[in-house]
Regions:
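Class I S-adenosyl-L-methionine-dependent methyltransferase catalytic core
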Residues: 2-32, 70-76, 86-148, 152-335
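Short secondary-structure junctions
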Residues: 35-40
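Short beta-strand
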Residues: 43-49
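A generic structural motif
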Residues: 50-61, 330-332
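Terminal-region recognition feature
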Residues: 52, 64-74
Length: 335
């Protein structure tokens, strides 16, 4: 009989009480969506000495691959081996397991960037992971992946994915958002002594502007920003390459479902066109405005998208605050 190793993982701490329940709501789903899921048993949320932990058992000893994947979870913090007792000492007893997620740029890059309507950076990391886990590239290193946010706003998705190690590209129609994001990248890299090369260009035929950043010296990542219409994403991102993942948080300023449906109706076919086969899109939205069934029907109209609605992807709805009482997440694969 194969022995098991019991693990207790702290929930990721949140900077704001506004998001205090975020990890509690989503940590189990993130773990069960990951490549680790087939090796896990008895996954449950519990409390040890008044602190919340996600507890589970792993078949056999904990491996380096286990630790690498656990360290990359957005909703988990410190990782511990859990003992009911050791010798005559009764538990629960915790043994810390060294686990760190390497960052290409400091993880505070996403946290430092402040702007109106910003999406929580821990949740953004979660979205990136859920897209990756649903794709054919779930076990790939982030350094091998390209991530696009076609509604990037102030850039939280870009900076989260860049920190993980991906090449990134973002589009937004708001001039202030894009220009201030380009300025922030330049200032942040200068202040943190991160090598940076940049170029700005005009795409006159498309009525758009692009900023191209090369971040790093020997180990380089690309960051492309585009001021333009997300519905023309394949044209605007020419030269970036087809992304493995598309990750975005749909705008909450849309007060009625019809404009949101119109936006997605215009954009989804182009997004599917540029996504690599086996890639995935993950997006969140205010589901009090447009319910999950209606959103699934909308995405389902794009023949090349296969909606991932198996557990745990079908239970990602959660409360955000008094304004957004219910936010949901939908993930779809590119056939």
């Amino acid at each position: 009989m194969t022995s098991t190793t019991k693990i207790a993982a702290q929930l990721a701490p949140q900077r704001s009480t506004q998001y205090s329940n975020l990890a509690r709501d989503l940590a189990e789903a993130e773990l069960l969506a990951s490549p680790l899921a087939p090796t896990l048993q008895d996954v449950s949320l519990g409390s040890i000495a008044g602190q919340d932990y996600l507890q589970f058992a792993v078949q056999g000893p904990l491996t380096g691959e286990h630790i690498r994947l656990l360290a990359g979870m957005a909703m988990l913090g410190g990782i511990f081996e859990l003992f009911d007792s050791i010798g005559d000492v009764s538990g629960p007893l915790l043994r810390p397991i060294p686990a760190a997620c390497p960052a290409f740029v400091p993880q505070d890059m996403a946290a430092t960037r402040r702007y109106k309507g910003k999406t929580n950076e821990t949740f953004t990391h979660f979205l990136c992971n859920m897209a990756k886990y649903a794709s054919d590239f779930g076990r790939e290193e982030w350094a091998a992946l390209d991530v696009v946010d076609p509604l990037c706003g102030g850039g939280t998705t870009l900076f989260s994915a860049l920190s993980l190690g991906a090449d990134v590209a973002g589009i937004d129609v708001d001039r202030t958002d894009i220009e201030s994001t380009a300025t922030f990248i330049t200032q942040y890299c200068r202040e943190n002594r991160i090598p940076l090369a940049s170029k700005e260009e005009r795409l006159r035929k498309l009525g758009a502007r692009r900023w191209l950043f090369q971040i790093g010296k020997d180990d380089v990542r690309r960051c492309m920003l585009v001021l333009g219409d997300a519905g023309r994403a394949p044209e605007l991102l020419a030269g970036f390459g087809r992304p493995h993942l598309i990750v975005t948080d749909l705008p909450y300023g849309i007060q009625h479902s019809a404009p949101l449906q119109g936006l997605l109706g215009d954009c989804l076919p182009g997004w599917a066109e540029m996504l690599l086969p086996g890639g995935a899109i993950a997006f969140s939205w205010d589901s009090t405005r447009l319910g999950r069934e209606a959103m699934m029907a909308l995405v389902g109209k794009v023949a090349t998208f296969e909606i991932v609605d198996r557990p745990p992807y079908d239970r990602l709805a959660h409360r955000v605050d008094r304004v957004i009482k219910r936010r949901d997440v939908l993930v779809a694969r590119r056939r």
